């Protein structure tokens, strides 16, 4: 659809790479309703097609669409899914999931992982090179991912107030040791250590040239 078009970019999310429509059936309606989102989950072959899009550069960004609701809010509409609020969590899960399932399993390169999770979004939204790269003058926004550790997602490991994750019980072959924002450590070993009010307003510039974003 975007072939031959300029300034059209493609974004996906972890759920469309790792989960399938089987989640709607597994565990019955009370479990399946928690996976309501738009667009809906599809088949395994659709997952693989998106992985291929990441490899060849036709998919440029992996975001989260982080829009969780509590189990209570979901289950209130189990009798009619059309009234169910759509959305799941993803902010905390995105990076370890994609590094483990993408880089460590050989689906995408480390370079593509960095582009899709950081650099390309910064270029599209006019924040590069302040964001999305490590070079003189850039913000020192860094995560340290440790492939010698593992991490299991569960109700007691996440900080979202929705109370569950679509990846509950899934174990990654890596863990995030620390997160830095503008050179300051704001999270270490799954614990927030930053200061309230440390965020700043970012003023965007023009989007980086299309060819520089989509080049393989």
Briefly describe each language-model feature range.
Residues 111-112, 153-160, 212-215:
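Short, positively charged
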Residues 1-62, 79:
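Histidine/acidic residue-rich metal-binding segments in metalloenzymes
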Residues 11, 65, 98, 183:
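Residue-level signal for inorganic ion chemistry
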Residues 34-45, 84-90, 165-171:
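A short acidic, glycine-rich active-site loop
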């Amino acid at each position: 659809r975007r072939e031959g078009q300029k300034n059209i970019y493609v974004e996906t999310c972890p759920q469309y790479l790792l989960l399938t429509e089987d989640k709607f059936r597994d565990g019955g309606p009370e479990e399946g309703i928690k996976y309501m989102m738009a667009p809906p989950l599809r088949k395994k072959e659709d997952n693989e097609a998106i992985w291929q899009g990441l490899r060849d550069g036709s998919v440029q960004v992996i975001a989260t669409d982080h829009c969780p609701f509590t189990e209570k809010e979901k289950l209130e509409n189990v009798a009619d899914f059309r009234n169910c609020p759509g959305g799941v969590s993803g902010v905390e899960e995105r990076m370890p999931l994609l590094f483990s399932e993408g880089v460590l399993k050989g689906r995408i390169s480390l370079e593509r992982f960095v582009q899709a999770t950081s650099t390309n979004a910064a270029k599209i939204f006019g924040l590069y090179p302040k964001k999305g790269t490590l070079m003189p003058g850039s913000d020192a926004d860094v995560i340290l991912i440790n492939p010698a550790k593992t991490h299991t997602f569960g109700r007691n490991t996440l900080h979202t107030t929705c109370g569950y994750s679509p990846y509950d019980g899934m174990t990654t072959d890596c863990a995030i040791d620390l997160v830095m924002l503008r050179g300051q450590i704001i999270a270490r070993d799954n614990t927030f250590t930053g200061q309230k009010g440390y965020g700043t307003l970012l003023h965007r510039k023009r989007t980086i040239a299309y060819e520089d974003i989509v080049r393989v």
